[in-house]
Every structure is written in structure tokens, then in C-alpha cells.
Amino acid sequence: LADAATSYTDVMSEYDGGSRTFFHFRGANARLSAEHILQMESPARIFHLGYLLLLDELDKPDPQHGVVAARVLKELQAKGYETSVDVVSEEGGRFRSIVEPCLPHIDYFIVNEIEAGAVCGTQLRSPEGVLLRDRVEAAAEMLMHRGIGRLCAIHFPEGGYALTREGDTCWCDAIPVAAKAIVSSVGAGDAFCAGMLYAQHERMPLRDALRLANASARFNLF
């Protein structure tokens, strides 16, 4: 789009606590439409869409499918693509209203524990911040019941958990990293997602897929 600037994000990280603030400029991404995507022809096996809730045209309501993104994903699956979706963490009711209609048309749903909890309407950590493994498992099952086609993977600083359509499950602990060695955690979730998608593309066993995803996230920290 010649008349639109490229989208970008500035991330401000605290030196001590590691808290992050994101300043995002949508730019041309706000005008990415169903037509732009559906005219695409590619020999690739997996179509990855990111990020829902930041793509104005695709986040719009659709009378038949809930949101435009759901229609796009359904049509891509009909063309033979396996679909993957990433979302941006956002508070409020808009999150579920946009993400839920897409679930039946997503093959691989790879999200963090905050995003998984937001879709399911529950907290996956205790008030003290402890990861609740039973809730993680229940959230993955709930997401699969809502239509995810092949795999739901939930990642968190402690590691990752995955559930397949066939009912296979796996927990995998994160690879230990000394806090002082971490340069930034920005992009670690994306690195996990990339590792998991590569593993799915190569049809790797579930445990190996989680190990690769965790390793990819680990090396993103330096």
C-alpha cells in the first residue's frame, strides 16, 4: 500500500523488573483485508495469521462467521492450508468476541497462559502467581472442544503444555536460564510458536515438538 506506513512496535523494558510496555502503530496492517489474503497462492503448508485484535479489517464482524478472520481461515482450510493464529494479549470482552469465532477454523492454536485464560474466561494462575496445572489442562481441553483442529499449545515462563486432537498430552519444563543472563524476553513467545509450528510442519512427535519450542524460546532470551 503506497499510501500507508509500515506497522511497527516499540517495546520498553524495565532493567530491573522486566516489565514491558508496548507502543504499537498499526499502519498498513490496519488495512489488511480478506481479499489481500485470499488471492494469495503459495506452496506453503501452514498459513499463520498474527495478530488478531490488531488487524482492523479482519477483526470486523461478519454476519455468517462472527468475524472476517474466521471466514478467511475457513476458506484457507478449504484450499488445503493448515491454519495457525496468534493473538495479542488484551483485556476486556473484545478478546473473546473476536477470537472465539475463529477457533473452529484454526488447526494450531499456540498461546500463552494469559491468552488461553482470556479465551476460556478463567485465570490459569493462583492469586500468588503460581501456575495451576489442572487449569492449564482444562483450558486446553476447552479450547479443543470449541473446534481447534489439530493442536492446542499453551506456553508460560515455566515451560509448555500441549494437547492434540487425538488426545495426546505432554508437559515440558522450560530450559533453566540464569536471570542475569537474560537480555530481554521480548519475542520469546513468538520463538516458542515458531519452533512448535516447524515441529508440526515436520510431523515431529509431541514431546520433541515441545522441547524444540522451549529451546527456541530459550535462545531468544539472549
What is each PLM-predicted segment?
Residues 1-170, 175-176:
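Ribokinase/PfkB-type carbohydrate-kinase core domain
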Residues 146-151, 175-222:
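Conserved post-catalytic alpha-helical subdomain immediately downstream of the catalytic base
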